[in-house]
């Protein structure tokens, strides 16, 4: 059963302005696939993109969107949030406020659960079955980096920062100054290739760099693109 939202008065009011200029309108989430919405990049998570899967009985939030009136009202209008999966330690901004407002259950890989003290958190070790599919531990970007596999629409992988589009719009693991363990990240990519097939993985929704997708909002032919990666060259 989905948790009820608190009363309307719990919403964070928009900030007042002493100037005569009207504040710029905040962009609402946009539909990218059938029942999947992408939120605008969140400055508090260094430009991370959060997603909402809207189901009949369960709404599933992947990573934390910017917490403002526009996004809160959008979630209310869609029926609330039952689960929030945090795919890595850099995607948890405002997790407390989101849980307090929506009553959602938070899922996170167990190595990073300690970063959310005082919250109702379910940690998992390798995989955890959810109402929308399977959360999969994919260490490398961070110790507890994970992805969500949504077993609908031909298979959709929400990859967090484990797999991202590069400036050419091509999907790849990207090594950054924040990468925890590059070799483990490469191994985790290989584990996804071994786990899926062209018929079970059609799309990937990355957790950042979505501007490089040139408005598409997702990566199609997902398994084909994964299998074509030269992981040996990237590992060297």
Which role does the model predict for each range below?
Residues 23-72, 148-162:
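Conserved beta-strand hairpin/beta-sheet module of binuclear metal-dependent hydrolase folds
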Residues 37-42, 60-65, 82-86, 134-138, ...:
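Short, flexible loop segments at the rims of nucleotide/cofactor-binding pockets, characterized by
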Residues 50, 71-75, 167-172:
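A short, polar/proline- and glycine-enriched secondary-structure boundary/capping micro-motif
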Residues 38, 86, 108, 122-123, ...:
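Structural signal for conserved beta-strand scaffold positions within catalytic alpha/beta enzyme cores
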Residues 66-132, 221-230:
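Active-site HxH/HxHxD metal-binding segment of metal-dependent hydrolases
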Residues 2-21, 28, 59-61, 134-137, ...:
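Metallo-beta-lactamase
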């Amino acid at each position: 059963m989905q948790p009820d939202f608190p009363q309307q008065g719990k919403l964070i009011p928009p900030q007042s302005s002493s100037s005569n200029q009207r504040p710029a309108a905040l962009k609402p989430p946009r539909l990218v696939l059938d029942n999947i919405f992408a939120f605008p990049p969140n400055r508090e998570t260094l430009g991370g993109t959060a997603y909402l899967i809207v189901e009949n009985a369960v709404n599933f939030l992947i990573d934390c969107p910017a917490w403002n009136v526009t996004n809160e009202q959008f979630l209310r209008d869609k029926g609330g949030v039952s689960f929030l999966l945090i795919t890595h330690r850099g995607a948890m901004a405002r997790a407390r406020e989101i849980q307090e407002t929506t009553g959602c259950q938070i899922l996170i890989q167990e190595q990073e659960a300690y970063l959310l003290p005082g919250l109702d958190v379910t940690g998992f070790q390798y995989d955890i079955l959810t109402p929308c599919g399977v959360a999969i531990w994919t260490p490398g970007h961070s110790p507890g980096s994970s992805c969500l596999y949504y077993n609908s629409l031909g298979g959709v992988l929400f990859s967090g920062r484990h797999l991202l589009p590069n400036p050419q719009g091509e999907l790849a693991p990207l090594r950054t100054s924040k990468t925890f363990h590059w070799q483990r990240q490469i191994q985790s990519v290989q584990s996804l290739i071994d786990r899926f097939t062209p018929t079970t993985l059609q799309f990937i929704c990355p957790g950042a760099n979505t501007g490089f997708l040139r408005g598409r909002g997702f990566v199609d032919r997902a398994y084909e693109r994964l299998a074509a990666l030269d992981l040996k060259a990237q590992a060297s």
